Amino acid sequence: MNWYLWANIITAVGALGGFIYGGVLFFRPRKAVYAQMITFAVGCMAFGRIYQVIRMLTIHDISSQFHLGFLGVIGSLLFLFSANYGAMDGLVDDKSKELRKYRIIPLAAPVLFLAIYLIFFLFSDQPLRVKIMAGVITVNVMHASYFNLKHLIFPDVEYGVINCLKGYNLLALIFELLCVAEMLTMNRDFQVLTFVIGILMGVILPMMVIAVNRGGKKWSA
C-alpha cells in the first residue's frame, strides 16, 4: 500500500468537497470576503493535493525537488493569514492597552513552530533544499497561527463576531499543526503517521468551511 498516495487522495477529496461547498455558499452577492478567503485556502489545498496525486501516479515521487503541489500548502496558509489579518483583525482588536496580553499570549504559537523548525531542520544535517522548503512553510504557519490563536482567545468586546468563529479558529490551528507534523513525518519517512495526518486533514479542511458558515449564521441570527 502506498501510504503517501492515499494520504494525498484523502486530503484532496476532503478539501475539494469543502471548496465546492464553500463556493456554493459564499460566492454570491453580499457574502463575506472573509468566508471567501477561507474557501480559497481550502481550494489551494485541494488542487495542490490533486497535483501531488497525479505526480505520484505518473512519476512516483513528490519529494525529490520543488514542485507545484508545495504551493498548495503555501497558498492555503497565505489565505488563512490574510483572512484573519486583513478582513477580521481590525474589527476585533482596537489596539487598546487593556487588551495587550491578548496580543502577547498568541506569540506562543509561532514560537513553538519556530522551535520545531530550528531543532528538526535548520540545526540538523538536512539538505539545504529541505531546510529552505521547511522554512518557507514554517514562516507561513507562524504568521497564520498567531492570528488564529489570537482570535481564539481574544475577548469579543464590540461586534460579537469573533465568539462565533472560535470553532473555525481552533480547526485552523489544528490544520496548521498538521502541516508541520506532515512536514516532519514525510522527512523521516513515517508513512503510517503521514497517512493518519492525511485523514485528519481530509476531515478538518471541509470542517473549517462548515464552521465559518455556522459562525456566520450564529452571528447574524
What name fits each language-model region?
Residues 1-20, 69-70, 127-138:
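Hydrophobic transmembrane alpha-helical segments in integral membrane proteins
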Residues 10-22, 34-58, 70-81, 111-116, ...:
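Hydrophobic alpha-helical transmembrane segments of multi-pass membrane proteins
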Residues 18-28, 53-105, 114-121, 148-151, ...:
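Internal transmembrane alpha-helix with an interfacial aromatic "cap," most often the third helix
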Residues 29-44, 95-107, 156-169, 219-221:
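Membrane-interfacial loop-to-transmembrane alpha-helix junctions, especially the N-terminal start
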Residues 48, 123-154:
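A mid-sequence, solvent-exposed acidic-amphipathic segment
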Residues 61-72, 126-137, 188-198:
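Non-cytosolic membrane-interface motifs at loop->transmembrane helix junctions
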Residues 80-83, 141-221:
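C-terminal transmembrane-bundle signature of multipass membrane proteins
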Residues 108-132:
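Membrane-helix boundary elements
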